[in-house]
């Protein structure tokens, strides 16, 4: 399988993880235990705690007003239990560190999920983007959003915070084919570009959030239910990196909506086409598609049944062909004088043919 997939590991990213079950102070202590630093209480409107890592990068624990707060026993709790972990700008090699931080927060009592109005936001560096690659990015999301929302298990409780691509914006984007990022910005804000300065612009609540791109030069994938499973978070980040790499390297991505009667198979094919193939991404693929319905090996499951029946018929036919010569030899042996040595069965017997293994070609 060929493709330009090296960029998956070359892009920078950041993650915001919302949770509750512990206080911001406790979360900061848990993060500091991993990073080897000391929590520094900054305060401010987000009641922020900062922790520096060995590279002097700032990991922050901040307040988020949207979180439904509970304590470690699941009882309603104060706003001190509204926790959002904000990473610094990270590189692919930092993935194990991110996972250790996540595990530490969970071990300290962190809980999360749609029932707490919590989510995960993955930010990808926008520096390499041009107008064409930004258009590609939007088209990828538009064409694969049905896949993504099922793969990432977007809860209906959170859909107001991660809406699908605005179809009016999508239509204008592909009809006008803007040549500059500034032109795309005007389309995104429907002409009101002053919104770029409003942190809580209503345009930010999209699964593919370009408000973040125009304001901070990084685009945001919001279509993730929150989790404190380190492997799942790694899968979310890698998926966002792979989508971004496709947007940056492909000449054109179609906005045509992908549909499938076998979502498990189609999602796997799409992930492999994004470059998430091989042993390195095995767990990533597993986390993203294991809960989907369908047959992972066959686009049309009925073909698998036909294939098994065909192979069974071939094995039966092969056995009959091997048995028949032996019968003929035995009949001939009855008419042969005793002094002529009788052929051994091993001269006629053959090994049974092994069942053919089929692999899906991509």
Predicted regions mapped to residue ranges:
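C-terminal accessory/tail domains of diverse enzymes
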Residues: 1-114, 127-362
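Short, conserved phosphate-binding/catalytic loop or strand-edge motifs used
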Residues: 116-124
């Amino acid at each position: 399988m060929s493709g330009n997939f090296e960029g998956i590991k070359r892009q920078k990213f950041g993650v915001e993880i919302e949770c509750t079950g512990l206080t911001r102070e406790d979360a900061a202590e848990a993060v500091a235990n991993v990073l080897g630093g000391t929590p520094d209480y900054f305060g401010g409107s987000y009641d922020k705690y900062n922790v520096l890592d060995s590279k002097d990068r700032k990991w922050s624990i901040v307040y988020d007003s949207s979180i439904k707060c509970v304590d470690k026993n699941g009882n309603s709790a104060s706003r001190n239990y509204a926790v959002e972990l904000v990473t610094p700008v990270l590189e692919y090699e930092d993935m194990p560190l991110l996972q250790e931080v996540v595990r530490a927060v969970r071990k300290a009592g962190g809980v999360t999920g749609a029932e707490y109005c919590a989510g995960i936001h993955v930010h990808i560096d926008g520096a390499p983007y041009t107008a064409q690659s930004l258009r590609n990015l939007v088209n990828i999301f538009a064409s694969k959003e049905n896949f993504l929302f099922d793969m990432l298990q977007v809860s209906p409780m959170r859909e107001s915070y991660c809406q699908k691509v605005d179809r009016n914006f999508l239509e204008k984007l592909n009809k006008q084919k803007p040549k500059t990022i500034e032109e795309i910005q005007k389309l995104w804000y429907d002409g009101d570009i002053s919104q770029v300065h409003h942190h809580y612009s209503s345009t930010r609540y999209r699964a593919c959030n370009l408000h973040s791109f125009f304001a901070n030069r990084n685009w945001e994938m919001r279509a993730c239910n929150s989790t404190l499973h380190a492997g799942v978070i790694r899968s979310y980040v890698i998926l966002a990196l792979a989508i971004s790499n496709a947007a940056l390297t492909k000449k054109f991505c179609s906005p045509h909506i992908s549909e499938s009667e076998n979502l498990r198979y189609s999602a796997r094919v799409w992930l492999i086409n994004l470059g998430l193939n091989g042993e390195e991404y095995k767990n990533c693929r597993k986390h993203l598609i294991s809960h989907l319905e369908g047959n992972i090996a066959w686009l049309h499951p009925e073909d698998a049944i036909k294939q098994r029946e065909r192979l069974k018929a071939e094995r039966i036919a092969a056995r009959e062909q091997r048995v028949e010569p032996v019968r003929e030899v035995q009949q001939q042996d009855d008419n042969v004088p005793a002094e002529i040595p009788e052929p051994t069965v091993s001269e006629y017997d053959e090994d049974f043919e092994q069942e053919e293994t089929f692999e899906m070609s991509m």
